[in-house]
Amino acid sequence: MTPTTISRALAIALAMAATSLSATARHEVSPVMSASASVSQTEVAKAFDNDNTTAWTVDATLLKHPQWIMATVANPGDVQSITLTQKGATADQLRKAIEIYVTYDPMNLGEPVDFTVATDRPTGNTILKFPAKYGAHVRLAIKPGVISRTWNIYEMAIAIEAGDSVADDSGIDRSYLDTSLPIDRRIEILLAQMTPEEKMELIREGWGIPGVKRLGIPDIKKVEAIHGYSYGTGATMFPQVLGMAASWNAPLLYKVTEAIGRESLDAGSIAAWSPVLDVATDPRWGRCEESFGEDPYLCSEMGKAWVNGYQSLGLITTSKHFGAHGAPLGGRDSHDVGFNEREMREIHLVPFRNVFRECRPQSVMMSYGDYMGVPVGKSKELLKGILRDEWGFDGFIVSDCGAIANMTSRKHYTALDKIEAANDALRAGIATNCGDTYNDKEVIRAATEGRLDMTALDDVCRDMLRVMFRTGLFENNPSRPLNWDKQFPSWQSPEHVALAREMARQSIVLLKNEDSLLPLSDDIRTIAVIGPGADNLQLGDYSGKQLPGQIKSVLDGIKASASPSTGIIYSKGCGFTTDDPAGLADAVETASKADVAVVVLGDYSGHPSIDGEKRPTSGENHDLASLRFQGMQQELLDAVCATGTPVVLVAQIGRPYDLSSASRQTKAIIVNWLPGQEGGLATADVLFGNYNPAGRLPMTFPQSAAQLPLNYNFKTSGRRYEYVDMDFYPLYRFGYGLSYTTFAYSNLRISTLPDGNVEVKADITNTGSRTGDEVAQLYITDMYASVKTRVMELKGFRRITIEPGQTHTVTFTLTPYDLSLLNVDMDRVVEPGDFKIMVGGMSPDFTAKDRIKDSLGYPEGRGVTGTLRYDIPAGARYEFTITDISHNLTDGSDIVTVNVTNSGNLTDTGQLTMYVDGTRTGDTRHYELNPGQSKAITFTVPSPEGIGSPWKSLNFISRHSSIFHNR
């Protein structure tokens, strides 16, 4: 759909409406970028096509049920009216039937606006007027049974308040454009030119950062890009993230995100709200599909590859959702997690720490939840202490959509109103608000009147400007307005299409292959292809619109790959989510005619109004309680298996599912995830043996949702592990996956190097008859420690190609940090003792009884196990020195500089708190230093009277030492 302005008649009507709304405010019609509806989805574009002869039509029978239409505007702003060219509803019916929602977050509509209905006499158009409200999405919800006739909307125009006239640009000191000046100096010069309104304009969000025209501050167009450029039609769609994690191939992921970056840059988007670094520990969570899985090391390595690939083109990444968003209570999206500091630092903060310390991304998105009981949106501990002070982050923080407003009565109940919420967020360092808080008129007025914390506002503006100067955007800004219909040169390039297919192939996991049914023989006479996913491949959340023929389904792939002598017959069988059993009989008949049946089941992430489905089953706000196939899918599989025809299940899923029944009934199971546009061809490559599968599970597959939580790296229990009615073991363990060949592990060598690192080597032999990839995985277990440690932890992996009969030596290096733990004092240390070292093609076996760590290991050939005796204790040792005390003549405060040095032999964090005359003063300061590294930390001793601080003593206290200074 092309963004359009409305017809001349509508423009006249809107101008009249604007005049009646305000004598001074200016209004303009916003182009619409996209639209959706509860019914007639394919026709909804007609309500925005500048053609009064075409319409979005809702039949009278459908109006007996709730319906809706939603538009996304190209220019987010203060929406103040909607003009309808419509037929079939009276003004009174519209008053009673319609609820209008204006929102920045379509997942959280908020409250409907109060509106009036007027008819423009010259045109006959209907004008819905309401107090201006900031938003990017406008939704009309239609109550059932009020409009009695078929309703046609020929045109729907959305008016927003235009911005104020540009302030006087005379007398501006534009020396901030001088690239020879230090960046910090350029920031201060520019900041001094900005009005409070311009500072608020800089930090609002509207499909990116809008910039400030008067001062030449550039805009930054952003995109959601976790598995492809999503703000357009026809960009290359790669497998969803969880599938790419299943490849266990970080170098290949680097190439993928480099390609996504190229497609983003071509489209004029220079920042991506990606990747997701959440450690997904609950498969019920709908957003598992966006994550790299349940292990912090795997998430770290794949996350670093994602960030480095995209940033290689000079683009901006925004890692999300910081922190602990991937473990919501009960798997319910955005619910709080409530973890203690140990759990956070052992698991959920790890990928963020590793990515921010090693890749230096320019931006991060905070999460909806809380940290230690404090909403992340106001957590200085998390957003300043850990993120900035410990990890050295010096970019800008983005709020998740609506997260600042959530601190009011929407969720957290920690702020009485938006002004308090805005102040809390600014003081925590949140620079960009996806939502309507920083854009709220009262909040902006508070800034002009000094009721916002202006020091905090200046600080977040500095964060934003620092990134703009550092990336050269003032000199060369590739950002361009979004165009959802234009295709760009790199989109669907042969190289990117081939890369999408390769990543899809490498992500496929073979879970079962009884009697070596796979790969399918060329001699098979007839293949039945059955299931709702067979000819309707699902891409997952945050996917762009597709061109005709862009998506290749499994049915397409099988038809393209099967022998010319093999007949292909197809039956859908049932929908993804519907309860209609009418198609089961046809599926049974189809399967009965075939030599083998390929049944494609799984998640649905499309448009229900187009596909006739009830709802999506995976993605944001689509969480599952049962982990069972929805609708009639399980009944379809049962019926097809009952025919006696050998069944291959293709699980097209965005999370682990309960495959217990399927594992008993089918001959073979492959998981192709949500495999991207080339997924059908890639799946057929595996089915017919044109590619030897080597994907490995990035998440544990339980026997039942009743086992949850069930992660491979659990901690030992004081009592029994099993239930009365179910044992403890998963159905398919983390790291698991089969191949069409076999591998044998041998000759484990473990040696401690002079620098304290540990070298681990193992030999892997391809003992089968086909070339294949093996994913060698290194796990360690700390056998005895001063605190409880995890049963096992992944510490390395390599994906390697080995020819038949060939032996490959894989080498890993463990650092002292890899062997470390957080002791009872939360200090990171290496405790001398025994470590079990295990290398294999999946996570190790264990017996869920007493002495569980002793039972860890592999069956003969499946992996190798050894013991490392490590006798080198390690830990940080911090030394503190007051190096300077200076007086601030402006406010009378004293600035105290404390130098912190790590003279130990291990990287660790620490905290330092200042006490002035025995009273704690200011925020606790965090640090994380490598051995031999120093950091200068400044503290401010305030002066109550502004004439000098009368303090007598200063005491700086860390966890284990203090430094005292008398005046």
Put a short name on every predicted segment:
Residues 118-122, 799-808, 860, 927-935:
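Short proline/glycine- and polar residue-rich coil/turn motifs
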